[in-house]
Amino acid sequence: VRDLPGELQWHVDQFSFIENPELRFRLGRAYYSARYVYKLMEATFVSGDERHPFVKFQIMQYASIYEAVVVHLLFEKFQNHAEVADLQSHKAYKPIAALAGVTEMRYGDEKIHTCVYRDAKTPRNSIPFRDKVDCAVRIGFVSEAYAEDIKRTYELRNLAHIETEAAKQLEVEIEQSKTAYWRLQPFLEQATTFLSENGA
């Protein structure tokens, strides 16, 4: 497509800090695809409802890129960082047999169970993306200046389900996909610089 900066390999190279070659390629291809679709949208002079699928696709691509990079860096590069350990733990009640087997306590008609309140591991897919971005900001590989826009792009992707769109009367706009694009290069530069300076 005319005026698309760089070929596919250029886009892949923007993720040079990702050591996994398959993930790096797929991230680059997603970036290239988002840019390609934007240029295609421009070339076809679409507007109104005809523009909607182009914008929706771009938001989905950029949100997926942000998510994949943040998750990969948190759990592959910084899995031993104190912030990541905190992110993956929560307090939970764990039942224990503190009383003799024949002893039973009740509150009205309900049986009372003894428990301890201790740290428990939170499954990665149960951690909200907003919390992952905040953790990345505290570690330093995501700039606080762009964190809210990254979270918003991800929220828009999740709100792109037709039923949710209808219930909340939401429309994705071209400006939202442009913001997702404009934030990506500084996001990648911040990650690259931080990893280089910290030997990660």
Predicted regions span which residues?
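Short, hydrophobic, well-ordered secondary-structure elements
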Residues: H52-F78
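Charged alpha-helical initiation segments
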Residues: V1-K56
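Short, flexible helix-adjacent loops and helix caps
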Residues: E42-V46, L74, F78, E165-Q169
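Generic structural signal for well-ordered, non-transmembrane alpha-helical segments
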Residues: F25-G28, Y32-R35, M60, S64, ...
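Intrinsic-disorder-associated interaction segments
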Residues: V1, S16, N20-L23, L27-A30, ...
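Charge-enriched, short contiguous segments at helix-coil
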Residues: D134-A200
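Short non-catalytic regulatory patches outside canonical folded cores
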Residues: V70-A145, E163
